[in-house]
Swiss-Prot record:
The keyword Signal applies. The keyword Plastid does not apply. Pfam families: 7tm_3, ANF_receptor, NCD3G. Residues 1-32 form the signal peptide. It comes from Rattus norvegicus. This is Metabotropic glutamate receptor 4.
Amino acid sequence: MSGKGGWAWWWARLPLCLLLSLYAPWVPSSLGKPKGHPHMNSIRIDGDITLGGLFPVHGRGSEGKACGELKKEKGIHRLEAMLFALDRINNDPDLLPNITLGARILDTCSRDTHALEQSLTFVQALIEKDGTEVRCGSGGPPIITKPERVVGVIGASGSSVSIMVANILRLFKIPQISYASTAPDLSDNSRYDFFSRVVPSDTYQAQAMVDIVRALKWNYVSTLASEGSYGESGVEAFIQKSRENGGVCIAQSVKIPREPKTGEFDKIIKRLLETSNARGIIIFANEDDIRRVLEAARRANQTGHFFWMGSDSWGSKSAPVLRLEEVAEGAVTILPKRMSVRGFDRYFSSRTLDNNRRNIWFAEFWEDNFHCKLSRHALKKGSHIKKCTNRERIGQDSAYEQEGKVQFVIDAVYAMGHALHAMHRDLCPGRVGLCPRMDPVDGTQLLKYIRNVNFSGIAGNPVTFNENGDAPGRYDIYQYQLRNGSAEYKVIGSWTDHLHLRIERMQWPGSGQQLPRSICSLPCQPGERKKTVKGMACCWHCEPCTGYQYQVDRYTCKTCPYDMRPTENRTSCQPIPIVKLEWDSPWAVLPLFLAVVGIAATLFVVVTFVRYNDTPIVKASGRELSYVLLAGIFLCYATTFLMIAEPDLGTCSLRRIFLGLGMSISYAALLTKTNRIYRIFEQGKRSVSAPRFISPASQLAITFILISLQLLGICVWFVVDPSHSVVDFQDQRTLDPRFARGVLKCDISDLSLICLLGYSMLLMVTCTVYAIKTRGVPETFNEAKPIGFTMYTTCIVWLAFIPIFFGTSQSADKLYIQTTTLTVSVSLSASVSLGMLYMPKVYIILFHPEQNVPKRKRSLKAVVTAATMSNKFTQKGNFRPNGEAKSELCENLETPALATKQTYVTYTNHAI
C-alpha cells in the first residue's frame, strides 16, 4: 500500500495499530490448532470465508472480574443458533455451493469494554506485521502465520456493545449484522455505516409502546433505563414519541447505574413511589437490572402497585421473573415478531458433550443446566450436587424453552450468507469456489449486497434492510399472566406500523380484566373544566363551572345567555322555566278571598241601596256620590283578578287602567264629600249664603274631573310606553341556577307603579286633611267622622304597604310578595271604606227600619250656631272626642216647612 491513499489509511488506523501492538502478546496464535477445536476463550471453525460472532456467553463480572455467571439462554442458545445456521448453509447446495463458511466466535461477557478487547481479534489479519528486523536462530526470516480474515461479524447483543464494536469495525470496513441491538443511535448511517440489524430499531419499539400506553388509557408513566446506549436511547425515543403523539406525560425518568451500589434499587423504587399515580413503569433495561428492580419492589411490599411495560430486552424471558412471578404479574412486554424454530429445537436437544466439542463453553453449560459436575474433584464433600454421567439429555432431564432471539441470530447469519452468495454470483460468474476478486472479500462491496438482500427468514418472515440498515418494525406483544398458580407469557397483540391489541385477553392483578389506572389526574366530571399544571399537560386540577356557567370544552366555562341556565351536568344551557302567579298559588288565596268577599259585600250594599233608594237614610247619604264610591270600591276588589290573571297585552292594559282608577274613583268621591262639608261650614261662619258647587250635579262634575285626571295620565302613559308583557329573568335569578325562574309579568316598573298610584295617594292624603279639618262637625249632621276614620285607617294600611312592597324588591319571591301586598292593601282600603261608610247604614236599613225615617230640617243658621257652640264647648270638660260637644240646641230646633222664598237656606239632615 503506497501513495497518499496508503499513508492516509495508515494514519487513520495509527491509534488502533498502537493498541494492537500492546495487545498482540496476549492475542493467541491459531497456528497448529486442529479444525473445530476450542481456541482458548473463543470458538474457531475453519472455512473458506470466516464470519465473526459476538455473544454474551457470560454476564458482567463483579469485583474486578471481567465475566460473571454463564447465560444459558441469552448466551448459549444464541451461540448455538449461529453454529446451527452455519451448518445449514454449509450443507445447502444452493447457497454458496463449494464455499464453506467458518467462524470465530467470542464472548463479550455483557460488557462493552471487554467486547472491544475481544473484537480486536477480528482485525488482526488486516494489520501487516513488519518482520524485517526479526531473524530466526538460523539467521533466516521468521515464518509468520497470518490469522484468518473475518469478512463480517454477527453481533453483538447489547446496543452499547454493538456501538463500541461498530466504531472499530467501520475503520476496517468490516460489515456487522446484529441480532438483538435495537438502540436508535445505531440508525445513524453517518456514524455506523457498516452496521445493520435484523431486528427493528427502538424507534419502532418506542412507538409501539406509546401506542400500547394510549390504548390502556394511561397518560402518566415513569421510565426506567439501564445506563448505556440501549436503555438511555430507548427511553429517549419513548419520550420523543410520546411528545409527538401527545397525551402521555413522563412523571420521572430514572436511570440505573452501570455499576449499582448496594441499596440502589431500593432507592429507585422509593423514588418511583414519589409519583404514586404513575403506576405504569416503562423499562428499557437488561435482564439483570429488571430482576433486581422486581426484587426491590417486592422488598418494598409494592407487589401489585406497579404495572411494568418491558422492552424487547425483557420480551418473553423467564430469567428476569424467576421466583418473582407475583411482582411481575400483569407485565406487558414487547418482542420483535418471531416464531420458534423447530429445527433448532431438534438440533439443540441433540447436543451432547461428545458431539458438541466445538463449543468450548458447552461443558460449563452442561454442568449449570443439569446441576452436576463433570470432574469428581470439583464435587464438594457434603454437597448435593451429583457427578455428570453424560447420559443427561436437554429437554428431558432439564427444562428447555427456545430463547427469543434465536430466530434473529439465524436470520443474521443467513443475511450474510445470501449477501456473499449474490456477491459471488456477480464477481465470480461460473466459478466454483472463491475467485481472486473475492480473495479477500471487499467489505464495502459486501455491505452493498447485505443492504440489498431480500429473502424469507427461517420462520418465514421477510428479511430486508432499509437505507440505514434497519429491519422493518414488527412486534408481538405479551403479557405475563398467572393462571391457576402457573405463569406464562401470553400473546395479546401485535404491532406492524399500527397497534392490534386484544384488551379482552389481558389479566391484571387484583382487578381481573378491568384496566388499571396510571394517570396524573382523574378525568374531570361533566361541568368541570381542566386547569392544567404548568409544564405537565397530563396533570390538571378540575374546577367546577359555577353560577350560570356551562362547560364549553375541556378547558373553558362560559356563562349561559341571560334567559337560560346550565343543565344539571352543566354541559349545555337550557331555557329558564317561566313562572307567574297562579290562581291556586298560596300567595293568591288571601287576595282572592278578600276580593270575592268584598265584591259580594259591595254588590249586597248596592242591591240594598237600590232597593231602598228612596228611603231617608239612602237619600241622606248622597245617593249620587255613594254609587260612584261603590263603583270605585267594586273596581278595587276587581283589580285583584287582573293582578293574578296571566299577563298578556289585554291584561296588562287593563291593569294600567283599573289598578289606580278604582282608588281614584273612591278617593275622588270621598274628597268631594269632605270638601263639600268643609266649604259649607266655613261659608256658614262668614255668611248665611250657600257656597257654590254643592249641588249633586256639581258634586258629580267635580268627582269626574278628578277621575279624568287619572284617565288622562293613563292615556299619556299608553302613548309614551305601550303596554306589553315581559319575562323578567332578574327577579328570581338565584345564586343556585337550579332555582332560577323567569317571571312573566306586565312591564310596569316600581317607578311606574308609584306614578300610577301616586295620584290616588294624593287624593287620599287630601281627603284625610279635609277629614281632619271637619272633625268638629256634629256627627248627626254629616259623614265627616266616618270618612275621617276611613281615611285614618287607609293611611295606616298604605303606610304598612310601602315598606313591605319596596323592602322585598331583592327577594326571589318578589313577584308573589309584591302582588299579594298590593292586592291585599287595595282590598283592605276598599273594605275599610265599605265597612265604615256603608255597613252601618245597611244595618239600620235591614235591622232597624224604625230609624230609617225623615228627620227635621235644619237651617244653615242653626248649623252654623251649632258649629260655633260646639267650638265653645271644647274649652270645657263636658265634651266628646274630636271636640264634638253634646248640644241639645241643634237636636231640639223645630224648622217650619220649606218655603219657596224662605230667608234661610235649609239642608236635609245627614245630607250635609
